[in-house]
């Protein structure tokens, strides 16, 4: 019939939130590794022998993160002292985690706003 059909395919990134969730999951399960020389090859093995060997899909790291609790200008860490935390959260914004066991002061604040409600 003389007509042509063109099919074009392309790869697209998933939504940013999905990428972030996958990275966070990998970060939470990351394995600390060290280099070992086996023959003439250098391989990465878990620093803790009780951990399973990592796969090509796993996130691994060689050096531990600095202690983010304390002020450390050398590593660019501002520390967490004086920061506002969420008393009910179990995540990184929660007081138990953010305050690094130093304890925290609570403050109850009442905010009154006009809401332009119509009855």
From Swiss-Prot:
Disulphide linkage map: 69-100, 85-95
InterPro entries: Wnt, Wnt_C
GO CC annotations, alphabetized: extracellular space
Lipid attachment in record (O-palmitoleoyl serine): 1
Post-translational modification: Palmitoleoylation is required for efficient binding to frizzled receptors. Depalmitoleoylation leads to Wnt signaling pathway inhibition.
Keyword line: Developmental protein, Disulfide bond, Extracellular matrix, Glycoprotein, Lipoprotein, Secreted, Wnt signaling pathway
Recorded superkingdom: Eukaryota
Keyword S-adenosyl-L-methionine found: no
Compartment(s): Secreted, Extracellular space, Extracellular matrix
Glycosylation sites: 86
Biological-process GO terms, alphabetical: canonical Wnt signaling pathway; cell fate commitment; neuron differentiation
Any one GO MF annotation of this record: frizzled binding
Gene3D superfamilies noted in UniProt: 3.30.2460.20
Family designation: Belongs to the Wnt family.
Annotated function: Ligand for members of the frizzled family of seven transmembrane receptors. Plays an important role in embryonic development.
Name this protein carries in UniProt: Protein Wnt-4
Gene designation per UniProt: WNT-4
